[in-house]
Every structure is written in C-alpha cells, then in structure tokens.
Swiss-Prot record:
It is a multi-pass membrane protein. Part of the high-affinity ATP-driven potassium transport (or Kdp) system, which catalyzes the hydrolysis of ATP coupled with the electrogenic transport of potassium into the cytoplasm. This subunit binds the periplasmic potassium ions and delivers the ions to the membrane domain of KdpB through an intramembrane tunnel. The gene is kdpA. This is Potassium-transporting ATPase potassium-binding subunit. Its main location: membrane. The keyword Heme does not apply. The system is composed of three essential subunits: KdpA, KdpB and KdpC. Belongs to the KdpA family. One of its GO terms (molecular function) is potassium ion binding. It comes from Bordetella pertussis (strain Tohama I / ATCC BAA-589 / NCTC 13251).
Amino acid sequence: MNADFLGLLLLYLAILLCAAPLLGRHIRQAINGERTWLTAWGQPLERGLYRLAGVDPAAEMDWRRYAVAMLVFNVLGVLAVYALQRLQGWLPLNPAGLPGVAPDSALNTAISFVTNTNWQGYAGESTMSYLTQMLALTVQNFVSAATGIAVLIALVRGLARHSAATLGNFWADLVRATLYVLLPLSFILALALVSQGVVQNLDPYVEAQTVQAQQYETARLDAQGQPMTGPAGQPLTDTVVTRVQTLPMGPVASQEAIKLLGTNGGGFFNANSAHPYENPNAWSNLLEMLAILLIPAALCWTFGEMVGSRRQGVAILAAMTVLFAGFAASAAYFEQQPTPALRQAEAALLADGGNLEGKEARFGVAATALFATVTTAASCGAVNGMHDSFSALGGVTPLLQMQLGEVIYGGVGSGLYGMLAFAILAVFIAGLMIGRTPEYLGKKIEALDMQMVALVILATPALVLAGTAVAVLADAGRAGVLNPGAHGFSEILYAMSSAANNNGSAFAGLSANTPFYNVLLGLAMWFGRYTIIVAILALAGSLAAKPRLPASVGGMPTTGPLFVALLVGAVLLVGALTYVPALALGPVAEHLQP
C-alpha cells in the first residue's frame, strides 16, 4: 500500500465522516416530519402527493401492513418498468430507434432496478431509449433507495419505541425520504457532475470518423432485433470492422447522481463509471465515491439520534469503518503488485504501477481499488474499472464484501438494517458467553427475534451457494462462462453474490444476458431483497411490542470498543464460515495455479 493510496483513503474517510453527522441529523428531522431548510417548498408538494394518492400520513401501520404496502408498491414498480422496456420502440424520446427489450431481459432489468440491485445484462446505450432511462430506471433509482430508508426507519422505530403496536406509515416514510433527502442531494450532485463534463442532453447520437479502423465483436441479432444464442445457450457474435465511431448522448448526469446517492449502480453506459461521459476526471471520481457512502454513513447518525444515544450510531459506524479500511487496504495491496504474467516473464522489476489491466489511466490503481471497495461495501455496483481484471486475490475484496451481506456501510437503509441484525447476533453471543439474557437497547432478545435475525443473515448465502451450484451444473450456465477453470467459477460465484446481495457489479467475463441467467439472477435479486426486508419488519414489530428494560449492572454496553470488536468479529466469522469453501474453489485456487 503506497502513499498515494493512503493519502486518498484518509482524505476520503475524513470528508465522509465529517459530512455524515450533518446529513444524519437532517434525515432524522425530515423523516419525523420536523421543520428543515427544505420544508418551505417540500411541504406543499408532500401534502399534494398525499391528497393525490388518498393517503393519511398520520395513520400508523403495524409491521404486516407496512410490509404489504411496501411489497405492493414494488410489484407495481416491476410491472411499470417491464412495460416501458417492452414498448419503448413505439414510445417517444428514442432518437436511436431502439426496439423493445426481449421479455427475459426486460423482466431481469425490472426486478434489478426495483430491488436496488441494478444488475445490467445489457449495454445501456444500445438497448434503452432516453424515455426508458428516465421514466423507468431513474424513477426506480429514487424509490428503491427510499424503500430501503423506509424499512430501516421502521426497524429503528421498533428499537426506539416500547409497548407499541405500530412502526409508522410506509407512504409517509417513502415520500419524505424522496423529497427531502434523495431529490435535493441528487440535484446538487448532478450540477457538480455537469460542471466536470458529465453529459446531460436529449441530443441524438453523434457519429465520428476515426483515423484507424476498429475491430470488435457484437451480438448477432434476429429479425426482431434480439440477441441470438447457439444450441448450448451461448451468445452468438459477429466481427465488425469500421472507421465510424458512435458517440452516445443522453440525460446522463441526472441519472448518474441518484445512481450513486441511492447506491443503485446501474450505468447509463455499458462501461458505467469507467466511461468518460459518466466519470470524466479525478474530481468527479472523488465526488462519485463520496456520494456512494454518504447516506449509508449518515444513517448511522440518524439511528443514534432516533434511539436517544448518538454513541450507539457511532459504535455501528466505527465497526463499519474498521472493516472498510481493512478491505480497502487489502484491495490496494494486491492490485499494486505486478501481474503473474509480468512476474513470470521476469519483467516485474521494470513494471511500475501494479496491475493496470482493466483500469482507466486517468484514475490509476489506487483510485480504482478504492472505488471497487466503496462500491461493494455499499450495495451500489457502479464501477470505474473492470473487476474481472483484478488479480485473483485483489478480486476477493469486492467479492467478500458482498458476501458478508452488504453491511460494511451497505446500501441506503439496507446496509444499516443488515448491520443491526449482526449487532443483535453479537449481543446474543455475548449473552450466551456470560450466562445472561441478551438485551439490545433495553429490549430483551428472544426466540422470535433470533429466528428473524438468522433468516436475515442466512437467506442470501443460501441463495448465492444454491444458485452457483445450479449454474455450474446446468449446460446453459456453463455456456455463459468466458474463462475456463477457477476463474470461470469465480465469475459465476461473483454474479450470484452480486445479485442475491443486491449489489449489481459483475465479473463481466460472464455472458449473463441469456434466458437462463436472466431468470436465475432475477429470482436471486427478488428473494435476496424481500426475504430480508420482511424478516426485518417482523423483527421491528416484535421489538416495538416489548417493554424497555432499565439498564442493569451486568449488561453488555453497546457503545464501546469491546462491542465494536465483537461486532466486527461476528461479521467476519459468519462470512468465513459460510463462504471459505467456495472462495477456495475460485479465487484462492486461481491464485495458486502456476
């Protein structure tokens, strides 16, 4: 780990941790309906939306009604996004004349954006019209992030309230998170990105003549304009040689902002944040990294204020930061080593800069390694380099961060409610060790609570490992693997880990835009998101109904270094026990190969 990376990491964490308390306090005020600097313009719009939808924001919901409202809203979102994709060939704002998206790809994409995953088996500039990008995908970037915040707030209310039967109102939480948090921040960030050169227009694509002919592979399309596959399910491609380069345009900055702030991750372009029209320079790169973790870090402060003890939120944030710093250092160390090919050719002594394969020269190894750590610490999935080109052990960092459940900061809302499940597990383990009934924030942790916590922690590993096994055993699953051997297994494992944990990044050597992977990954995304959310809401309902117990002398404090260490240990231990065998078959085996 060199001085460049260390300086970048320290600068990043300093800005992030200074901004988190300010935003965290604002989120608490906004969600609770208190007056903020945005109330003057936001409140009339908020009230108008309630009247239009026939919603009483003061009507409290128990956890079941809260869950039903959330599920209905998200199912309707899937239907809307699917319909817009299928019909885009007949809809306006389609200057490239792109046809409707294939049914399996449209369903996968609809589930992906509604679940805050933003897994993309397609290239945005050659698949989605401007209308689809704006009305379908960008809208879901807002409301999927707001859904995560709403579910977290319901859990925090469950911890803060006592002897209560309700958790708040889903519709009010959704609207306030969107109006007072996501929209203003996205507007500010979009303007900042435009100032750095990010594209924002509705112009047709521009064709430019290149000096040198280019040769590339493109998907073979049928008469309906859909990708064709061979007998074994592998994608069919054609070689194209041309001197014409198409420069895609579009409303990029407005989607880029919420893609990052909402930890969504789906790029307007296929190259995502490695594309110069999405992420032009080092300043925009720093802004994008800060945007990804800003709200997840701030929500820790919101949690502390809502439960009446800021130190509770600081302890959770400290555990997240310790884990994040360790993974970031690991990624940087392995990526700053020469590649095995250079070392074998005895060129390592002359090589400078480490593993530059798959990295943009304008960012370099340090910024790419940090971005990869940031995007997989959050359930974001945006990338500024090719994760598939990371070294075998360098690629373990993004992979393992996802497999730990996206709780190292994590997604907007989802990261903190996942980490709170680990916090309850940690105090449960501590209670067993000292022979006391476990308590967290004055709430006794009982059988139902631990059942829900176990479901939250074990649901995604089950989906990841079962899905990987299915893909490896199926002919259609193996047909999508570009690289044989251990790395091919890693590509499948990464895809399932990304989908089930709602991250969305990929080892892009896997050809995943096939009916097999669109269905398999779609199921992983859906159940990986909503199994956990329903379990979290059930846990919140159980905790809200409990009386608050007075602090006892022998109770374990949940604000000090001991608790932080126990929480970090619980996260790492569960991850190690669950995924070490799979990691041994993939990246570890690849690293040990001659």
